């Protein structure tokens, strides 16, 4: 994916990268193992994450410790108090971490007893255009403060993991409900679709889609329901301009 996208791999030199810093929203395996592929960077990575994520990444899933045997990292603690911050080289962009109610990974001491900072979404604002995007990859409950960010965004990238709560267990891939894993399904009353259809302003895009989800079939009835509600399904190479 990096090699196929020139802004992230401009190839100006050997082992080049267009990545200036890295933001981590949680310590889940599939959200963080990509750091290992970036271990040969020519200097320590500047990584932005909450304290609880940092603790997971240095204990139960110690990727940061492993990176320390290469170039290492510079950790920048992210507040859970919804305080906007900026990142050097990310010109005209303001980031705000927003605590989400979801689930901590199995190796976290907060499993089934989460604390603010185990999972965050992001408001990402372009100060030149005045527009903003809200990103929420793991969302178990849509709390009031999260709904306000959704309502006021120009683009929403939101958890689209499953269509039904029991989808993965019915498919035989595991014995858990999506809600037990910190994901709100799309089709139930009060689920992701109901939430998105109540929003008038933003462009609505589903992300973090599990391979059991029938919306991946463009000809499925479920996909037709999304289309009729102007809800998009993300895809590799998708380019979003705000």
Language model segments and positions:
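Pre-active-site segment of Zn-dependent metallo-hydrolases
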Residues: 1-27, 33-41, 142-149
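Active-site neighborhood of phospho(di)ester-bond hydrolases with catalytic His/Asp-centered motifs
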Residues: 1, 18-30, 48-50, 134-139, ...
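Short acidic/His/Gly/Ser-rich catalytic and metal-binding motifs that mark active-site loops
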Residues: 32, 104-106, 164-169
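Long, hydrophobic, well-ordered secondary-structure blocks that form the structural core
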Residues: 37-77
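Phosphate- and divalent-cation-binding pockets in alpha/beta enzyme and binding domains
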Residues: 1, 31-34, 56-59, 215
């Amino acid at each position: 994916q990096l090699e196929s996208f020139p802004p992230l791999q401009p190839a100006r030199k050997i082992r080049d990268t267009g990545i200036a810093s890295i933001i981590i929203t949680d310590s889940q395996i599939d959200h963080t193992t990509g750091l290992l592929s970036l271990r040969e960077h020519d200097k320590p990575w500047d990584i932005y994450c909450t304290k609880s994520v940092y603790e997971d990444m240095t204990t139960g899933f110690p990727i940061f410790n492993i990176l320390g045997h290469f170039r290492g990292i510079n950790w920048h603690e992210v507040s859970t108090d919804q305080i906007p911050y900026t990142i050097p080289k990310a010109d005209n962009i303001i980031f705000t971490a927003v605590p989400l109610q979801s689930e901590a990974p199995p190796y976290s001491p907060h499993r089934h007893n989460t604390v603010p900072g185990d999972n965050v979404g992001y408001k990402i604002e372009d100060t030149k255009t005045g527009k903003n995007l809200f990103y929420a990859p793991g969302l178990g409950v849509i709390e009031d403060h999260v709904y306000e960010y959704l309502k006021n965004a120009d683009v929403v990238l939101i958890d689209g993991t499953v269509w039904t709560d029991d989808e993965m267990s019915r498919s035989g891939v595991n014995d858990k409900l999506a809600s037990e894993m910190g994901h709100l399904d799309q089709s139930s009353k009060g689920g992701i679709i109901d939430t998105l259809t109540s929003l008038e302003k933003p462009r609505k895009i589903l992300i973090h889609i599990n391979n059991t989800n029938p919306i991946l079939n463009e000809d499925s009835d479920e996909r037709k329901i999304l289309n009729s509600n102007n809800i998009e399904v993300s895809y590799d190479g998708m380019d979003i301009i705000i």
